[in-house]
């Protein structure tokens, strides 16, 4: 999973309000630009009043994106965007920077060039245009996302080196897109047979009653300045605001008294305020104390929540805290559990229509991803890196590891040499907890079309997180989908519980609430119980700050090793941990760091030059004279020195003729007219090639299976030689002499 990340309601649940609008308008930035700038950026000749108005509006946009109104970001200072801090040059830089941000936000669907900025800014600021544009571009503030060119439109960024990315979650995919736009050769190795990691949308239900349900990360937490909002905008995907109305019910199904509810909510928030006061007084002594122990001691000290109903209500709020942090309160640091609060994205929490898979699918477009590749070892050194998957060895200049913290804790990937001690200690200290779900699709919506969330209290404190909150996904899933959340200690017990018993319990809760109202609760059409803790590709849900840990550990985990080994993922960002947008932003961050490190190595003349420079189209033509496998218009070659079904090879597809629809699809893919006959290629495993041969039907059906079911992309011979030169070289050399026994299937 690359994030069931913290898709919660605000930690301090606000007073529940009346129903809001059903669909959230994500075009607020467009409206702001239209209102204040007339919808278009003007040329250089403007009145003084026009310039002042434009500058003020662009400053508003920059602030909404997290930039200070009259200062530089720390990253800008480190990048040396101005020669001297303070003064006129810095002020001018900020105005130019804000203009570039506003200019790109006015149309996030196209690449914004430096030349376009020069059209609207005076020539005297050309050096500031370059400084601001380069900083914003390379740090992922502009020209990111989907619908942008995968290859760099800038000539200076056409041969930056090669990177292997481990993990095809949000972090890995955002980094891949960005690195490819920078001119890097990139491949992604994914252990699962699907992309997305901890973001996983499952099609549930039956014919005529299907629903797209997010079993992992589901809520976009705070839409203001959220990069996932940009992706949704680029793809024209509507967002649905999670409405504030969240009625609570007692264990017997009766509604909670609103007066008691409001009072306990106030007590809960005051207890958290007291924790903040207490830790200031205690200083460093509070580092060894859990949030749970402090809250319980304060509750006893002030004598609050004494009655059964009050205690159950307080437990509901505590379960919500455990949900927000994917951890038991007894594990959370009283000092640093909320260290990321100052950085939280503003605005509403939203669901994405059709599920977050739509973002993942768009991010995968054009990115070479190899599925079913469970990484065993990552070797790194001065000359480059090697990623080992079974008997396969993939080589490149650098590697970006985006696996979840739970995988790093399990030490299932061997690093050679071993990771630095401070990084290993940070991995050990950090917390990685659980959130599980019971996802159900019903014949119809019985809980109310105007309700997004409702909650249920528990009789027992140790089970307070079991089905404590329900999300109605009917507004975005396409069906009557309802999700029950399981947090805290209950999420751990959930892992080993019988699914049929879990379903029986959750239906008992629902029927206890709705049957007394005269509402029949039908049996669900389909039910899925998640088990993120036992998932070997995640071993949990998302990170939190455990006792004796701090936000510094996120920074340590994000540190690269030797300028060759890099790390991304929600557990590497102290500002946005446990969120989908945090994972996405960490990928952009590491793309920038990889670019910087690669250029530094180039300047020091230490870059490892790619081998196999003698490979060309003639080599490829020669190899396919004697294919290992031929069926219809498909030919396959591979390394004859191994019988491993997972060993990689090359498939050639010959198009002697094709229908108008297929030809149009191919021409759209390659963005140019194509002449027949035509030969295209892809890289796949021997097992995939053999399975393709067994697909019944003609070549058209096999081609559809290749591109849609296997998710493979066809490329021309030049692109294949550029991308898979080492694989071609390995196959060629193994055919000449059979003395080698190591399979190198991925030097890029």
Regions found by a protein language model. Give the residues of each.
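Long, charge-rich, low-complexity intrinsically disordered regions
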Residues: 1-100, 126-140, 144, 148, ...
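FAD-dinucleotide binding site
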Residues: 45-70, 75, 112-118, 139-608, ...
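Short helix-coil junctions and helix-kink-helix linkers
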Residues: 85, 115-126
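Short helix-capping/hinge SLiMs at alpha-helix to coil transitions
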Residues: 105-109
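A short, well-structured beta->alpha microelement
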Residues: 198, 623-646
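Short, well-ordered coil/turn residues at beta-beta hairpins
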Residues: 402-403, 652-654
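Mid-chain, well-packed structural core segment of small domains
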Residues: 659-692
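Class I S-adenosyl-L-methionine
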Residues: 694-743
């Amino acid at each position: 999973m690359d994030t069931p990340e913290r898709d919660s309601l605000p930690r301090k649940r606000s007073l529940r309000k009346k129903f809001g609008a059903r669909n959230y308008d994500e075009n607020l930035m467009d409206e702001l630009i239209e209102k204040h700038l007339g919808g278009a950026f003007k040329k250089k000749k403007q009145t003084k009043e026009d310039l002042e108005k434009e500058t003020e509006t662009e400053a508003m946009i920059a602030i909404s994106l997290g930039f200070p109104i009259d200062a530089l970001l720390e990253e800008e200072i480190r990048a040396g965007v101005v020669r001297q801090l303070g003064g006129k040059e810095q002020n001018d830089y900020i105005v130019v920077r804000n203009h570039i941000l506003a200019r790109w936000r006015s149309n996030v669907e196209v690449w914004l060039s430096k030349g376009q900025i020069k059209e609207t800014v005076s020539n005297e600021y050309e050096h500031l245009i370059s400084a601001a544009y380069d900083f914003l571009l390379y740090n992922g503030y502009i020209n990111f996302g989907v619908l942008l060119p995968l290859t760099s439109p800038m000539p200076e960024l056409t041969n930056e080196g090669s990177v292997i990315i481990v993990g095809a979650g949000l972090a890995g995919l955002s980094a891949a897109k960005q690195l490819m736009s920078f001119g890097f050769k990139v491949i992604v190795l994914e252990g699962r047979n699907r992309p997305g990691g901890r973001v996983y949308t499952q099609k549930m239900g039956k014919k005529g009653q299907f629903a797209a349900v997010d079993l992992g990360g589901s809520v976009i937490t705070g839409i203001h300045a959220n990069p996932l909002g940009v992706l949704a905008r680029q793809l024209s995907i509507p967002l649905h605001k999670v409405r504030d109305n969240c009625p609570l019910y007692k264990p017997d199904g009766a509604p909670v008294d609103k007066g008691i509810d409001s009072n306990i909510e106030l007590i809960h928030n005051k207890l958290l305020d007291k924790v903040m006061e207490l830790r200031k007084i205690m200083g460093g002594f509070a580092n060894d104390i859990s949030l749970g122990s402090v809250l319980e001691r304060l509750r006893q000290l002030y004598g609050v929540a004494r009655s059964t109903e009050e205690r159950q209500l307080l437990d509901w709020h505590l379960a919500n805290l455990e949900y927000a942090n994917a951890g038991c309160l007894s594990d959370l640091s009283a000092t640093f559990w909320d260290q990321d609060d100052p950085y939280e994205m503003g605005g509403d929490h939203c669901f994405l229509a059709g599920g977050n898979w739509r973002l993942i699918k768009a991010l995968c477009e054009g990115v070479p991803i190899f599925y079913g590749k469970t990484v065993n070892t990552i070797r790194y050194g001065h000359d480059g890196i090697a990623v080992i998957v079974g008997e396969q060895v993939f080589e490149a200049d650098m590697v970006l590891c985006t696996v979840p913290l739970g995988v790093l804790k399990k030490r299932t990937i061997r690093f050679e040499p071993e990771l630095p001690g401070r990084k290993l200690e940070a991995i050990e200290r950090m917390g990685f907890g659980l959130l599980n779900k019971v996802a159900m699709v019903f014949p119809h919506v019985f809980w109310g079309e105007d309700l997004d969330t409702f909650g249920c209290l528990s009789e027992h404190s140790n089970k307070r997180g079991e089905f404590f909150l329900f999300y109605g996904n009917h507004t975005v899933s396409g069906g009557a989908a309802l999700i029950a959340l399981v947090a805290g200690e209950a999420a751990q017990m959930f892992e080993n519980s019988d699914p049929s018993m879990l379903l029986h319990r959750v239906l008992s809760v629902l029927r206890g609430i709705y049957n007394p109202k005269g509402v029949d609760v039908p049996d669900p059409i389909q039910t899925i119980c998640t088990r993120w803790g036992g998932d070997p590709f995640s071993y949990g849900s998302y990170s939190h700050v455990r006792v004796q840990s701090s936000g510094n550990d996120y920074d340590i985990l994000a540190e690269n090793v030797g300028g060759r080994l890099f790390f991304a993922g929600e557990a590497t960002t102290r500002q946005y941990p446990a969120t989908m947008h945090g994972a996405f932003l960490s990928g952009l961050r590491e793309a920038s760091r990889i670019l910087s490190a690669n250029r530094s190595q180039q300047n020091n003349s230490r870059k490892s030059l790619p081998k196999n420079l003698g490979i060309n189209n003639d080599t490829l033509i020669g190899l396919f004279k004697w294919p290992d496998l031929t069926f219809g218009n498909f030919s396959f070659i591979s390394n004859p020195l191994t019988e491993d079904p997972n060993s990689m090879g090359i498939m050639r597809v010959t198009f002697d003729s094709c229908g108008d629809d297929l030809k149009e699809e191919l021409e759209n893919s390659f963005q140019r007219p194509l002449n027949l006959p035509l030969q295209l290629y892809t890289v796949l495993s021997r097992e995939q090639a053999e399975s393709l041969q067994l697909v019944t039907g003609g070549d058209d059906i096999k081609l559809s299976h290749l591109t849609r079911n296997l998710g493979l992309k066809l490329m021309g011979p030049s692109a294949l030689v550029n991308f898979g030169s080492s694989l071609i070289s390995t196959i060629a050399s193994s055919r000449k002499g059979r003395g080698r026994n190591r399979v190198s299937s991925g030097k890029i």
